[in-house]
Amino acid sequence: MTTSPLDMWKLEMAVKSSPSILLCGAKPWPGSRDPDHRRHAPNANWVTTDIEAGTEVDIVADLQTVFQAEDGKYVEAFDGIFCPAVLEHIARPWVALYSMAQLLKVGGSLYIQTHQTFPLHGYPHDYFRFSREALELLCFDAGLVTLQSGYDGPCSIVPPAECAVWNVLAECFLNVTICAKK
């Protein structure tokens, strides 16, 4: 059986005694499920970031520029980065991936969960949907090596009648995930 990207990332974090992990998109927003991401690495020292201040936010920053301006304070500072449902909201995800790669220690691992097929939603904008190959390419261009990628949450698109046959032949998934390593 294939290990999921999330399970792969959890294994990467479990071999470290007290990993430092950056949680991206930490601010709870109205209507969110508020999942406890810390359960994936309970022995870790978690640092949180978001583009807006909030009760769960340690660092207010934009992942496209965040850690480049702070005199290198966070360069190679994290053993892991956990980035759930954030990348689709970033105008330049390739810049954010490069920035996240700079934040990882050598040997550090990144987990991203974003959407392949999903309704439009804000906070504050909704820019992209991704395929598995797109995430792999973005990570590669940022200097990261893919350990595992995949889709989850099979779904259906209800197309107009003239496109009905297309939906039968094409797979759709709510989520696409990746675990990559520096």
Positions of PLM-derived features:
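Class I SAM-dependent methyltransferase Rossmann-like catalytic core
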Residues: 1-16
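Conserved SAM-binding loop
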Residues: 19-121, 132-136, 178-180
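Core dinuclear metal-dependent hydrolase active-site scaffold
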Residues: 25, 156-159
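A generic structural micro-feature
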Residues: 40, 72-75, 127, 168-172
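Active-site rim elements
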Residues: 121-125, 166-167
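Residues that flank catalytic or metal-binding motifs in active/ligand-binding sites
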Residues: 124-126, 131, 172-176
